[in-house]
Amino acid sequence: MKYSLIAALPALAAASPTFSTETIHKQSAPVLSSTSAKEVPNSYMVVFKKHVKDASKHHDWVQSVHSKNTQERMELRKRSSDLPVSNEVFAGLKHTYELSGLKGYSGHFDDETLEAIRNHPDVDYIERDSEVRILGGDEPETENNSPWGLARISHRDSLSFGTWNKYLYAADGGEGVDVYVIDTGTNVDHVDFEGRAKWGKTIPNGDADEDGNGHGTHCSGTVAGKKYGVAKKAHVYAVKVLRSNGSGTMSDVVKGVEFAAKSHSEAVSAAKNGKKKGFKGSTANMSLGGGKSTTLDMAVNAAVDAGLHFAVAAGNDNADSCNYSPAAAENAVTVGASTLLDERAYFSNYGKCNDIFAPGLNILSTWIGSKHATNTISGTSMASPHIAGLLAYMLSLQPAKDSAYAVADITPKKLKANLIAIGTVGALSDVPSNTANVLAWNGGGSSNYTDIIEKGGYTVKKAASKEEEKESEFRITIPSLSELEDDFEKAKESAGRKAHHVGGKL
């Protein structure tokens, strides 16, 4: 489905995406389509029924059908140029998928091959492949201050002049944890990663092992950068599923999820065999989204079932996140965006599929173009990596799997529940009643996971009135602090200028 890297700023009005189902014969597998996404012509994702154990015979069969139909078209074209025979070249089988709960494949097939697939007894359903892209992409202004988002997740109450640029954290946060950033890639040579970022996999065929867009690098920096990251010791693996223009296909995204899940499983096995010292687990971030995709949601849920802790962006359409994927994947942590002024960001999706909020407006992080590049952009794409980093941060506070003090794994389900339980309740304004008003919290710098969890949640104090706030600000008159005060006031003003950050769109 059209996948938009959920970053920067969206168009505000969006129709709720829905599925349409095509059935020609009663016994044929249905073909699912999203009415809100731009389809990739003749490209499909095929999902097997639960009884299928060994898919290799089916893969051989579908390739033979594809080859036979291709040969017949070529023969027809040779016989007569007057016949209405397609000149399109169909690529055949593209990816195979094998995750717990999801087994299938994708490919580029003609209509005859598609009909044969639909009538095969192994096939549960077929989903039309569709485009994915970055959500937004406007070039925003850049602030030179430390990210306010890091400060916000480490403080319970609204940020003030004294706390707005102070991030409290455990020094070893992220140590021993791998984070798979499924995006446009990562500028792995950026100095902020200190050599902890590596290239994992490029899924789009023929694309370079580089981030030509910047979005993935920005997300990776928020996850694990030395200066800009939540979990400053975590290791990042770039999983490129979108091209440099920020777009791609659903089938490539699903393959990227599979790569991350299998890489995590391999890391677990290596740790058990003593080949990956100090390993504590894996998280993943996916700041992309679009129309509803049953296949992508199933892939994410399967990856979580395999032990991969997953954060996904809620979306930037100011609409119900349940109508978007992967935001609707129930096993993942679905993240909405908040502002410096403790509001729900005006673009952030909402609804019962949202699990938590994190900073997402005017977020400073790493960028492409040099080893020192930075950029400030906005979106739920920027909120989600705060949570992916926080999941890694929390995992790192546990003993390593090969340690004599190792404890039972914190399952993704348990850590998700704990993350929500310790969040700051009622922190934000403009949150619909059907949406959890919970802002992420990292424990305020504590390195004791048990202590953080036992502290539980927190309900914010009533915010000061505008008059009280103005009076308090007026009394800050210490000359040596005036420059910092100006920075804070400018940041607050910037957070309130909605139109400025969407290229003038209201």
UniProtKB/Swiss-Prot annotation:
Pfam families found in the cross-reference section: Inhibitor_I9 (PF05922), Peptidase_S8 (PF00082)
UniProt keywords, alphabetically: Allergen, Glycoprotein, Hydrolase, Protease, Serine protease, Signal, Zymogen
Enzyme Commission no: 3.4.21.-
Propeptide: 16-135, 459-506
Residue stretches making up the Inhibitor I9 domain: 43-134
Domain Peptidase S8 stretches: 147-453
Basic and acidic residues biased stretches: 69-79
Domain of life according to the entry: Eukaryota
GO molecular function, one term: serine-type endopeptidase activity
PROSITE patterns referenced in this protein's UniProt entry, alphabetically: SUBTILASE (PS51892), SUBTILASE_HIS (PS00137), SUBTILASE_SER (PS00138)
Glycosylated position list: 245, 285, 448
Stretch list, region Disordered: 59-79
GO biological process, alphabetically ordered: proteolysis
EC class: hydrolase
Role this protein plays: Serine protease.
Protein name as it appears in the record: Subtilisin-like serine protease Cur l 4.0101
Lineage: Eukaryota, Fungi, Dikarya, Ascomycota, Pezizomycotina
